[in-house]
Swiss-Prot record:
Cysteine protease that plays a key role in autophagy by mediating both proteolytic activation and delipidation of ATG8 family proteins. Required for canonical autophagy (macroautophagy), non-canonical autophagy as well as for mitophagy. The protease activity is required for proteolytic activation of ATG8 family proteins: cleaves the C-terminal amino acid of ATG8 proteins to reveal a C-terminal glycine. Exposure of the glycine at the C-terminus is essential for ATG8 proteins conjugation to phosphatidylethanolamine (PE) and insertion to membranes, which is necessary for autophagy. The lineage of its organism: Eukaryota, Metazoa, Chordata, Craniata, Vertebrata. One of its GO terms (cellular component) is endoplasmic reticulum. GO terms for molecular function: cysteine-type endopeptidase activity; protein-phosphatidylethanolamide deconjugating activity. A motif (LIR) lies at residues 389-392. Belongs to the peptidase C54 family. It comes from Danio rerio. It is found in: Cytoplasm; Cytoplasm, Cytosol; Cytoplasmic vesicle, Autophagosome; Endoplasmic reticulum. Its EC number is 3.4.22.-. The gene is atg4b. It holds the Pfam family Peptidase_C54. InterPro entries: ATG4_LIR (IPR046793), Papain-like_cys_pep_sf (IPR038765), Peptidase_C54 (IPR005078), Peptidase_C54_cat (IPR046792). This is Cysteine protease ATG4B. One of its GO terms (biological process) is microautophagy. The active site is at C74 (nucleophile), D280, H282. The LIR motif (LC3-interacting region) is required for the interaction with ATG8 family proteins. Required for proteolytic activation and delipidation of ATG8 proteins.
Length: 394
């Protein structure tokens, strides 16, 4: 195996290279650290991220399917990690820290239970694999980052606790109006941004309660998970995209990037110098079975060792970048940062526009309902993606 593709399975944890002694700032999901004076803080922050890896001996997918995702599920696990980070930000906050060996907050337990390897967990490997069948992917088949993004968008609809608005940007374009329609569906944008739908909604026959809820909703914003599938080059990443990509990790709304190299997928959470920092799903651990109260040993869901690093030029150009906006102000701030980055050196990775060009308007924009044909358009754009990644056998 090439040294550049060493994984946690092929290295003893004690042999993983520590962070370099460098004056270059370390950026992890919108936070800046010093490798010279804050190494413990860096490792604590990395350890607090959810780490989803291959698992074995879980319930058969679909009742008769695989009981392990080793060799084919790495991109699915990366999708779990980027969404897991969104749920952490949603329910616990970006500054939350994991404390090993201690009883955790109920919100944390609920988040982990959403990813447990069983069929009735919102974002389990079972749900992702079976939902992928609707995207034309058979169970056990490789997923590209755009397919994972589309599947996560579908699954989030059923997560009433988190109440996320998951948006997958199409055609390398982020449309501000489209996102605000999604995150504030109770506003009538056709009559003006401040207009509220006048249709009464019954809640168990209680119109007064419905009105109270409507008043509450007008002050709310459905927390946004924005996933942007991108292609930053042909066979290799275009160096003009390197600085804009780094800037994404510096934004407080950053959820990181899923992607990798031609033979494996990784979850990228930051960078130092010209090296990307990532969590690697390529180690196989036994499936965890929660107790009746929902609690279970959680050590295996946190990487308690220095994360992996790779030179940014080794990144496969097909990626999906993620961002989380808890409030409308967060989203407006993100838009301002993106416009600033677009005016700096390098090529913008995607376009940010106020409204959707008429020739690109889709039923999803008009109806505000999940349009499962979105992935078809993305697959045509990324039609070579799945062939470029190879299944990694360990």
């Amino acid at each position: 195996m090439d040294a550049a593709t060493l994984t946690y399975d092929s290295l003893r944890f004690g042999e993983i290279e520590d962070f370099p002694e460098t004056s270059d700032p370390v950026w992890i999901l919108g936070k800046q650290f010093s490798a010279l004076t804050e190494k413990d803080d860096i490792l604590a922050d990395v350890t607090s991220r959810l780490w989803f890896t291959y698992r074995k001996n879980f319930q058969p997918i679909g009742g008769t399917g695989p009981t392990s995702d080793t060799g084919w599920g790495c991109m699915l696990r990366c999708g779990q990690m980027i969404l897991g980070e969104a749920l952490i930000c949603r329910h616990l906050g970006r500054d939350w820290k994991w404390s090993p060996g201690q009883r955790q907050r109920p919100e944390y337990v609920s988040i982990l239970n959403a990813f447990i390897d069983k069929k009735d967990s919102y974002y389990s490997i079972h749900q992702i694999a079976q939902m992928g069948v609707g995207e034309g992917k058979s169970i056990g088949q490789w997923y590209g980052p755009n397919t994972v993004a589309q599947v996560l968008k579908k699954l989030a609809v059923f997560d009433s606790w988190s109440r996320l608005a998951v948006h997958v940007a199409m055609d390398n374009t982020v449309v501000i109006e489209e996102i605000k329609r999604l995150c504030m569906p109770w506003l009538d944008f056709d009559r003006g941004a401040c207009a509220v739908s006048e249709e009464p909604r019954e809640m168990n026959g209680d119109l007064e309660g419905a009105c109270a809820l409507a008043e509450e909703e007008t002050a709310l914003w459905k927390p946004l998970v924005l996933l942007i599938p991108l292609r930053l080059g042909l066979s290799d990443i275009n160096e003009a995209y390197i600085e804009p990509l780094k800037q994404c990790f510096m934004m407080p709304q950053s959820l990181g990037v899923i992607g990798g190299k031609p033979n494996s997928a990784h979850y990228f959470i930051g960078f130092v110098g010209d090296e990307l920092i990532y969590l690697d799903p390529h180690t196989t651990q036994p499936a965890v079975d929660p107790s009746e109260d929902g609690h279970f040993p959680d050590d295996s869901y946190h990487c308690q060792h220095p994360p992996c690093r790779m030179h940014i030029c080794e990144l496969d150009p097909s990626i999906a970048a993620g961002f989380f906006c808890q409030t409308e102000d967060d989203f407006d701030d993100w838009c301002a940062q993106i416009r600033k980055v677009s005016n700096c050196r390098g090529l913008p990775m995607f376009e940010l526009v106020d409204s959707q060009p008429s020739h690109l308007i889709t039923a999803d924009v008009l109806n505000l309902t999940p349009d499962f044909s979105d992935s078809d358009r993305l697959e045509r754009f990324f039609d070579s993606e799945d062939e470029e990644f190879e299944i990694l056998s360990l």
